[in-house]
Amino acid sequence: MHYRNLLGYFMLPAMMAVVTIAACAPRQPTEDRVPPSAMKEALSFKAPFGEARTAPPEIVASGKALFEGKGGCYLCHGISGKGDGPAAHMHSTYPPRDFTNCAFQQEREDGELFWIIKNGSPGTGMQSLIPALLSEEEGWKVVAYVRTFCAEQS
């Protein structure tokens, strides 16, 4: 009986340590933040001006102004889009996206980015910006600007 108690004293802390380490492990920089239950909806969203990667310069410029101004995106994502804005330190568990990560840019569809702007990112510090701060049209312009952070895109 003494052996079982001794084993319990070591196993419980060991199991708790494994769970804690797994929970605190850094998130993958390309990990999807749209919940699986909302993915179909996210993929159905389409920009009114066509694909965000090829948006006209005036749309991108408007998106930049919104990103750096009214939308407040730069506060967490930084002016450079690297996730290094002045408020980024407040999000230690799920840091803001690094939009310069081309793998992330290539793996995510425009509708996924728009869904996050519209609904926020559950379990992270990313809040919904539509309709509180941005209109849907403005949200799409921000997506077009975010797409410019990866210089390797086609």
Language-model features, listed with the residues they occupy:
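Axial heme c-ligation environment in periplasmic c-type cytochrome domains
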Residues: 25-30, 116-149
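Detector for the c-type heme attachment site
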Residues: 76-83, 103, 118-119, 129, ...
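C-terminal motif of bacterial Sec signal peptides marking the signal peptidase cleavage site
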Residues: 21-23
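Gly/Gly-Pro-rich "capping" loops immediately C-terminal to redox-active cysteine motifs
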Residues: 64, 78-110, 114
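Bacterial N-terminal signal peptides that target proteins for export
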Residues: 2-12
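Sequence context surrounding c-type heme c attachment/ligation sites in exported
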Residues: 60-74, 107-112, 123, 132-136
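Electrostatic cytochrome c docking/interface patches
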Residues: 36-68, 154
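The canonical Cys-X-X-Cys-His
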Residues: 63, 70-80, 142-146
